[in-house]
C-alpha cells in the first residue's frame, strides 16, 4: 500500500457537499410518481396482458408454469410469443424550460420528453424499438444497458463497435431483443454524453421476486442535471475538473434550491402494504446515496440479478446501477423525506443542490412537506455493497488465480498531452471509427483490428475468464470508476481494502495477501460495479455469448477520454450467429452514415463513444 499526497482537488474542483439531509425551500409543489410514469409512457404500446399466473402478493416467487425465482434465467426463458413494440422519435428543442424553472439552450428528447418511454415487458417477451433520428447534426445509437443480447450482438447499440450511428435528419433502424432476464434497467444513447441531453429512458421487465410485496410502484430514476449541454461539458472536462451538477432530478423532476421553482417527486404509500420500488442511477457523473427517513429498504434485485432479501438503511448507487427494493409502509401515516446524498468527499461527484429529495406520502395523511429531516446515512465512500447474494447461484474457484499480463487491465490517467485528461486501459485509450465498427471486420473476415479499438480478444469457449482491473499505483491521483460490461453479468470476486475514497491510498494486487480477500462462493453478480480509487477489482465472466462487448467506465467524461476496452468474444462463433437480416440492416445503416458523415459540420474529437460538438474554450467559465 502507498499513500500519496492528495492531488484530488484538481479533479474535484470544490469542497464536497456534506452528507446532509433535506432542508429544502418551503414549497409544497409535488408531482406524483404515477403521473410522471404515465407521461413517459406516451409513444409506447400498453403492455399486453399475459395469461393468469401464480404470481400474487403473497407468492411473488412463482411466475408461470415451470418458471419461478429459482429458474436459471440464463438457461430457460418463458416462450410468451409476445412482442412489445415502441417508436422513439429523437428531436432537438432550443430554449427548453426545465423542470426546475431554468431554460436550457438545447435538449435532445425522445417523443418530446426529458426521459423516453418506460419500456415495459414480461419475462420472455420480445422488445422491438424503432428509433427515428430527427436530430440536426448528431448521429445516435441506443444501448440497452444490462440486456445480455444473447445472439443479438448487433442490437447492443454501441456505435463504432456493433453498428454505425443512425444518421440525423430522418435516419432510422429497429432494435429487437428478447427479455431473457427480468428486473429493472435503462437505455441511453451511446453516441455520447448525448444521453445527458435527454436521450435516455427506463426498462421494466416483469418477473418473479425473492420477497412478497403488494404494490409495484414502478421505476424511480435519479440523475444529475446540468444547465449546460452535456456535449459541451464533455469538451470542458477534457482540460478541467468536472463541475458539480446544477441539480438532481428524481423521477424527472426537482426543486430549484435557489428559487424554489419546480416540484418534488411524490410517491404515495398505502398504509400497511409492501411496495416494490425500482431505483436507478441514470447519471452522467454523479453517484448517489439514498435513504428514506424512518424506514428501511429490503433489496430484492441488484442490477438485473434477483438476490436474497437484504434489509438496509441506505444504498449507494454507482452510475448505471439499479436496485429493486421493498418498502413496508408500517410507520405512522405522515410525509417522509427520501434523501439523496453524496459521499467520499466528492470523489464520485456532487451537486450544487445540497439537499436533493423526494416526498413519500402515506395515503390519508395530510399533505405538505415532511417535518423530520432524518439523520445522515453512513458514508459509503463511493463503494457498492458486496453483501448481496444472487438467488440463482454461480460459484468459481479463486484460490488458484494468478495475475498475468493477459488478464490484467491497468487503468491510468495520462496528463502529458492535449487534451489534458486522457484515460487509458491496457496502455491505450479507445478511439472507435464510427464508419467502420468492429462488426464490419467480423463480417469481412478482416482480423487487422486497429490498435485504437482497444480490443481484448477472448477465444475460450464456455469458460470462466478472470479479469483484474487496477488503478495506476503511480499516477498523480486516483479516482473511483463505475465499470460496466456489455453482454454479460460478471461475478465480483473481490476488491482492494475499503478506505476513504479521497485518501489517495494505493493498493496493488498481492496474491500473498489478497487471495484471502476473494470470494468465489456465489459472490455478487451484476453488470456495473465500482473500481476503488487507488485500488483493484477482480471480476469473472463466462464466455457463453459471442460478441463485441464494451467494458468501460460509465462516467461520461471518462469514457469520452478513452476509458474502455472492447472484449471481442469468440469472433469466429460470432460471425456464424449474425443473421442475414441483421447483416443487411447493419450494412444499410453504415452506408447511410458514411454518406452523411462528410457533410457533418463538427469534427470527431473524442473516443467516439462520447460525441460532442466543438465549442471554443472561451465559451467556458470555470466555477
From Swiss-Prot:
Q: How does activity depend on temperature?
A: Optimum temperature is 60-70 degrees Celsius.
Quote the record's binding site residues for Cu cation 1. Answer: 143, 484
Which positions, given as ranges, span the membrane?
none
Q: Give the enzyme class.
A: oxidoreductase
GO cellular component terms listed in the entry, alphabetical order:
extraorganismal space
Gene3D superfamilies, per database record: Cupredoxins - blue copper proteins
List the propeptide region positions.
Answer: 23-50, 610-623
Residues annotated as binding Cu cation 4 are 481, 553, 558
Return any one Pfam family short name: Cu-oxidase_3
Covalent S-S links between cysteines: 54-62, 164-590, 348-382
| Keyword field contains Oxidoreductase | yes
Q: Which reaction does it catalyse?
A: 4 hydroquinone + O2 = 4 benzosemiquinone + 2 H2O
What tissues contain this protein?
A: Secreted protein; extracellular space.
- Molecular function terms in GO for this entry? copper ion binding; hydroquinone:oxygen oxidoreductase activity
Positions annotated as glycosylated? 89, 138, 251, 266, 294, 339, 426, 446
UniProt-annotated binding residues for Cu cation 2: 145, 188, 554
One biological process GO term for this chain? cellulose catabolic process
Q: Where does Cu cation 3 bind?
A: 190, 486, 552
Q: How is the cofactor bound?
A: Binds 4 Cu cations per monomer.
Identify the EC number(s).
1.10.3.2
Q: Which cofactor does it need?
A: Cu cation
Q: Name the family the entry cites.
A: Belongs to the multicopper oxidase family.
Describe its assembly.
Monomer.
| Role, per record | Lignin degradation and detoxification of lignin-derived products.
| The protein's name in its UniProt record | Laccase-1
Question: Source species, please?
Answer: Melanocarpus albomyces
Encoding gene (name) = LAC1
Amino acid at each position: 500500500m502507498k499513500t500519496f499526497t492528495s492531488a484530488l482537488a484538481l479533479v474535484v474542483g470544490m469542497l464536497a457537499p456534506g452528507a446532509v439531509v433535506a432542508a429544502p425551500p418551503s414549497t409544497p409543489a409535488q408531482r406524483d410518481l404515477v403521473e410522471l410514469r404515465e407521461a413517459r409512457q406516451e409513444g409506447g404500446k400498453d403492455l399486453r396482458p399475459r395469461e393468469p399466473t401464480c404470481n400474487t402478493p403473497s407468492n411473488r416467487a412463482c411466475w408461470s408454469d415451470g418458471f419461478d425465482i429459482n429458474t436459471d434465467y440464463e438457461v430457460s426463458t418463458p416462450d410468451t410469443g409476445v412482442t412489445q413494440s415502441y417508436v422513439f422519435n429523437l428531436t432537438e428543442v432550443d430554449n427548453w424550460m426545465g423542470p426546475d424553472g431554468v431554460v436550457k439552450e438545447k435538449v435532445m428528447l425522445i417523443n418530446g420528453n426529458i426521459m423516453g418511454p418506460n419500456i415495459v415487458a414480461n419475462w420472455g417477451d420480445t422488445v422491438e424499438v424503432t428509433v427515428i433520428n430527427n436530430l440536426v447534426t448528431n448521429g445516435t445509437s441506443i444501448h440497452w444497458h444490462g440486456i445480455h443480447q444473447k445472439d443479438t450482438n448487433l442490437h447492443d447499440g454501441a456505435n463504432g463497435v456493433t453498428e454505425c450511428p443512425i444518421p440525423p435528419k430522418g435516419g432510422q433502424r429497429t432494435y429487437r431483443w428478447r427479455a431473457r432476464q427480468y428486473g429493472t434497467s435503462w437505455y441511453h444513447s451511446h453516441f455520447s454524453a448525448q444521453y445527458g441531453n435527454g436521450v435516455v429512458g427506463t426498462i421494466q421487465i416483469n418477473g418473479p421476486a425473492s420477497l412478497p410485496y403488494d404494490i409495484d410502484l414502478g421505476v424511480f430514476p435519479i440523475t444529475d442535471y446540468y444547465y449546460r449541454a452535456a456535449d459541451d461539458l464533455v469538451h470542458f472536462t477534457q482540460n478541467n475538473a468536472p463541475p458539480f451538477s446544477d441539480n438532481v432530478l428524481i423521477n424527472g423532476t426537482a426543486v430549484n434550491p435557489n428559487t424554489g421553482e419546480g416540484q418534488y417527486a411524490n410517491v404515495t404509500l398505502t398504509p400497511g402494504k409492501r411496495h416494490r420500488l425500482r431505483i436507478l442511477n441514470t447519471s452522467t457523473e454523479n453517484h448517489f446515496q439514498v435513504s428514506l427517513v424512518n424506514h428501511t429498504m429490503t433489496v430484492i434485485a441488484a442490477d438485473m440479478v434477483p438476490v436474497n432479501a437484504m434489509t438496509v438503511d441506505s444504498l449507494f448507487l454507482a452510475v448505471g446501477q439499479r436496485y429493486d427494493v421493498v418498502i413496508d409502509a408500517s410507520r405512522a401515516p405522515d410525509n417522509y423525506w427520501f434523501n439523496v446524498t453524496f459521499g467520499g468527499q466528492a470523489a464520485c461527484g456532487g451537486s450544487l443542490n445540497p439537499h436533493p429529495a423526494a416526498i413519500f406520502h402515506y395515503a390519508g395523511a395530510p399533505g405538505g412537506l415532511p417535518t423530520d429531516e432524518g439523520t445522515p446515512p453512513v458514508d459509503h465512500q463511493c463503494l457498492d455493497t458486496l453483501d448481496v447474494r444472487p438467488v440463482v447461484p454461480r460459484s468459481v474457484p479463486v484460490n488458484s488465480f494468478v495475475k498475468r499480463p493477459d488478464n490484467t487491465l491497468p487503468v491510468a490517467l495520462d496528463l502529458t498531452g492535449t487534451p489534458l485528461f486522457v484515460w487509458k486501459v491496457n496502455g491505450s485509450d479507445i478511439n472507435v471509427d464510427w464508419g467502420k465498427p468492429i462488426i464490419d471486420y467480423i463480417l469481412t473476415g478482416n482480423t487487422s483490428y486497429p490498435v485504437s479499438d482497444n480490443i481484448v480478444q477472448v477465444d475460450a469457449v464456455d469458460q470462466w475468464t478472470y479479469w483484474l482491473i487496477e488503478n495506476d499505483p503511480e499516477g498523480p491521483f486516483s479516482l473511483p470508476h463505475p465499470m460496466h460490461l456489455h453482454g454479460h453479468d460478471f461475478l465480483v470476486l473481490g476488491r482492494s481494502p475499503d478506505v476513504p475514497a479521497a485518501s489517495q491510498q494505493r493498493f496493488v494486487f498481492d496474491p500473498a495477501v489478497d487471495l484471502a480477500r476473494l470470494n468465489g462462493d456465489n459472490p455478487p453478480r451484476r453488470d456495473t460495479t465500482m473500481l476503488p480509487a487507488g485500488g483493484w477489482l477482480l471480476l469473472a465472466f463466462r464466455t457463453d455469448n459471442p460478441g463485441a462487448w464494451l467494458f468501460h467506465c460509465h462516467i461520461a467524461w471518462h469514457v469520452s477520454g478513452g476509458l474502455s476496452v472492447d472484449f471481442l468474444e469468440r469472433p469466429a462463433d460470432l460471425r456464424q450467429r449474425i443473421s442475414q437480416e441483421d447483416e443487411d440492416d447493419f450494412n444499410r445503416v453504415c452506408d447511410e452514415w458514411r454518406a452523411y458523415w462528410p457533410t457533418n459540420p463538427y469534427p470527431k474529437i473524442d473516443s467516439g463513444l462520447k460525441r460532442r460538438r466543438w465549442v471554443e474554450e472561451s465559451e467556458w467559465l470555470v466555477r
